[in-house]
Amino acid sequence: FLYQESYGSAQIRGNEELQNGYNYNFDLRYERFGKDGDMLSVTGYFKYLDSPIERIQALQGGATLHSFRNADNGMAAGVEVEFRKQLIKDLRLGANLSYMYTNVKLPEGGAYTNKERPLQGASPILANADLTYSPRFGEERQLNLALLYNLQGSRIHAVGVSNLGDIKQQTLHTLNFSAGYDLNKHFSLKLQVNDLLNRNVIFKQEVPSTGTEVEVERYKKGTDFEIGFSYKL
């Protein structure tokens, strides 16, 4: 059956011939902890991917149709750096940066346009940062304010088959804000604002015959607000 995504114009079809994918990973981590919750960690990792499931594209009556297919195998290797630091009393900065290299081996005689490429859905660069202010007022009352930034590098959104180029989601920046206030040990208030920047989500498709890319779709998810009130027994 077909279903329509909440965002974007593609229709999605399942694949009853899919097999489970498996991954086997090794990682090595160094961590250092300081006072006031300060922390630094560096992680290196390697993953072997057996029959990874990837999103692919096809054409059906001129409409955009996406489905899923197993690749033969693949690998992912990268490094991740994370730190937390108290700047002044009640004000804390945290950040995370990762770089990842991926490669996929495709089935012999398959219809994939690019015979060697990165793993679908994997961004080579990911970054997150947050600035948090959390003062206390007495024993029970506390204010929590946080500004959160995310960077997601360009990644393959749907794999090209039958001479169709790969569709790539372009680099995306997002900024969120959250606020919370504990009135006492029972009552608390919360405000969440997602995607303050409301940037366009842009997709471009490779044109194999010319080696260029053309924009095929863009949309905005919009900025949304959540207000909550909670009670703890």
Language-model features: locations:
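Glycine-rich loops and low-complexity Gly/Arg-rich segments
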Residues: 9-14, 54-55, 65-69, 93, ...
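Gram-negative outer-membrane beta-barrel transporters
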Residues: 45-48, 67-158
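Conserved C-terminal beta-signal and adjacent last beta-strands/turns
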Residues: 21, 25-26, 118-233
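A short, compositionally biased micro-patch
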Residues: 21, 33-35, 74, 86, ...
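Membrane-embedded beta-strand positions in outer-membrane beta-barrel channels/transporters
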Residues: 15, 25-31, 39-41, 68, ...
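Surface-exposed extracellular loop regions of Gram-negative outer-membrane beta-barrel proteins
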Residues: 1-26, 36, 44-69, 148-162, ...
